[in-house]
Amino acid sequence: KDELIKLHGFRIELGEIDKEFTNNKEVTDAITIPLKRGSEVVKLITFIISNKDININTLKDEISTVLPYYMVPSDIVKLERFPYNSNHKIDKNELINIYKSL
């Protein structure tokens, strides 16, 4: 199920962003997280899994050709694996902590 968010007045299905990233043969998996200030979404961050030496700037340029500008994430972070919580779901809070520690 896709998560619907609103950013700068645009409604965005986060799953659509993830799908475009995983359409790239270099990307094994992707998850996009909305970064909030209070209750307002201020930017999007996409975390990707890839075992390739992938150029993040090139990837962002490629994504910009298939997604509207307002759906292109501000930042892309490559990880070896996603953190999971005790319910075996991707731990989105931990992803935000990873992002903030960069």
Regions found by a protein language model. Give the residues of each.
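AMP-dependent adenylate-forming
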Residues: 1-102
